[in-house]
Swiss-Prot record:
GO biological process, one term: protein deneddylation
MF-aspect GO terms: deNEDDylase activity
Gene expressing this chain: COPS4
Similarity-based family: Belongs to the CSN4 family.
Protein location: Cytoplasm; Nucleus; Cytoplasmic vesicle, Secretory vesicle, Synaptic vesicle
SMART domains: PINT
GO cellular component: cell junction; COP9 signalosome; cytoplasm; cytosol; nuclear speck; nucleoplasm; nucleus; synaptic vesicle
Organism for this UniProt entry: Homo sapiens (Human)
Protein name: COP9 signalosome complex subunit 4
Biological role stated in the UniProt entry: Component of the COP9 signalosome complex (CSN), a complex involved in various cellular and developmental processes. The CSN complex is an essential regulator of the ubiquitin (Ubl) conjugation pathway by mediating the deneddylation of the cullin subunits of SCF-type E3 ligase complexes, leading to decrease the Ubl ligase activity of SCF-type complexes such as SCF, CSA or DDB2. Also involved in the deneddylation of non-cullin subunits such as STON2.
Length: 406
């Protein structure tokens, strides 16, 4: 049967007639090829592609029929469709400028097959082949934005945040031009994930936190975004930016529903966190967040050591490296190195006396500390009152009335 299809195509290519008549006849041959199965179907479809890219066939007919051809392929078995897609792309390549729209459609379908197979890298590379900026066809902003975001997401799935960042940066140039709110949300999610994978945790936390307030996002997904914001904040390097983010999250009542709230509370209140208190939280982290740093410690260990060092600076005026190491549960030399780095980067106030082996913390003003403690107390009292009103609303109402009557 494949031979019959090839023969019909050869006869039709040498015949004359109106574009409409010829297109109708080619369409009948395509339908015949689609009805076949197995190897016969594969050979017949390949013959059809070869005929369509032949220069003897009018470009008007070729484009129209290849578009029809692309609509049929998603209904075929994935293995057959994948082979046909690759064959078609190879045959079209010498005349790719003439078939840009059809090539884009083929690449989108082929990427979907690779995605179903969880072959993320090949899926991304197939989409990269669409000439969104360099081709003759003018693609609309939403199509380009959606494609760039899909490429970035696929590279993230393949654990390649560098390539993902390259394509999210291209999407950044387009997202302000799009009015599609759903795409805007996808952009923000993808950008937050890229920052997260690139270990830019505080920027990722800010993006996730912003997403957690978007009403267009489902409530469960908003809470998921808030959870990611909290995790990224805990993993971020200690400093003013992180302190501000901790304060923002601690004041957000939704965070009390999250499993990591206990760690958040300790960090916000500048309490020392012990290693055995981190096991449950460490189990919640994603694989890329469990990576080790240059000194061999995990990202979480490093973040907690820096937090504990900052907390110690608010408890002591000065401390020896030996005592600091014991407090942080690390060797004295490592404690000195981290303290030195934090002071140099302006993330902690103080200076190091290497002769005596002491780190001196600069005296902090008492008022801001008192303010923070009072603020924390008021916050906890408010939470307590809310819980009482939820448990005993009638008693609360009576107590309020009695208070007002005094």
């Amino acid at each position: 049967m494949a031979a019959a299809v090839r023969q019909d195509l050869a006869q039709l290519m040498n015949s004359s007639g109106s574009h409409k008549d010829l297109a109708g006849k080619y369409r009948q041959i395509l339908e015949k090829a689609i009805q076949l199965s197995g190897a016969e179907q594969l050979e017949a479809l390949k013959a059809f592609v070869e005929a369509m890219v032949n220069e003897n066939v009018s470009l008007v007919i070729s484009r129209q029929l290849l578009t029809d051809f692309c609509t049929h392929l998603p209904n075929l078995p994935d293995s057959t469709a994948k082979e046909i897609y690759h064959f078609t792309l190879e045959k079209i390549q010498p005349r790719v400028i003439s078939f840009e729209e059809q090539v884009a459609s083929i690449r989108q379908h082929l990427a979907s097959i690779y995605e179903k197979e969880e072959d993320w890298r090949n899926a991304a590379q197939v989409l990269v082949g669409i000439p969104l900026e360099t081709g003759q066809k003018q693609y609309n902003v939403d199509y380009k934005l959606e494609t760039y975001l899909k490429i970035a997401r696929l590279y993230l799935e393949d654990d390649d945040p560098v390539q993902a960042e390259a394509y999210i940066n291209r999407a950044s140039l387009l997202q302000n031009e799009s009015t599609n709110e759903q795409l805007q949300i996808h952009y923000k999610v993808c950008y937050a994930r890229v920052l997260d994978y690139r270990r830019k945790f505080i920027e990722a936390a800010q993006r996730y936190n912003e997403l957690s307030y978007k009403t267009i996002v489902h409530e469960s997904e908003r809470l998921e975004a808030l959870k990611h914001a909290l995790h990224c904040t805990i993993l971020a390097s200690a400093g003013q930016q992180r302190s501000r983010m901790l304060a923002t999250l601690f004041k957000d009542e939704r965070c009390q529903q999250l499993a990591a709230y206990g760690i958040l509370e300790k960090m916000y209140l500048d309490r020392i966190i012990r290693g055995n208190q981190l096991q449950e939280f460490a189990a919640m982290l994603m694989p890329h967040q469990k990576a080790t740093t240059a000194d061999g410690s995990s990202i979480l260990d490093r973040a907690v050591i820096e937090h504990n060092l900052l907390s110690a600076s608010k408890l002591y005026n000065n401390i020896t490296f030996e005592e600091l190491g014991a407090l942080l549960e690390i060797p004295a030399a490592k404690a000195e190195k981290i303290a030195s780095q934090m002071i140099t980067e302006g993330r902690m106030n103080g200076f190091i006396d290497q002769i005596d082996g002491i780190v001196h913390f600069e005296t902090r003003e008492a008022l801001p500390t008192w303010d923070k403690q009072i603020q924390s107390l008021c916050f906890q009292v408010n939470n307590l009152l809310e819980k009482i009103s939820q448990t005993a609303p009638e008693w609360t109402a009576q107590a309020m009335e009695a208070q007002m009557a005094q």
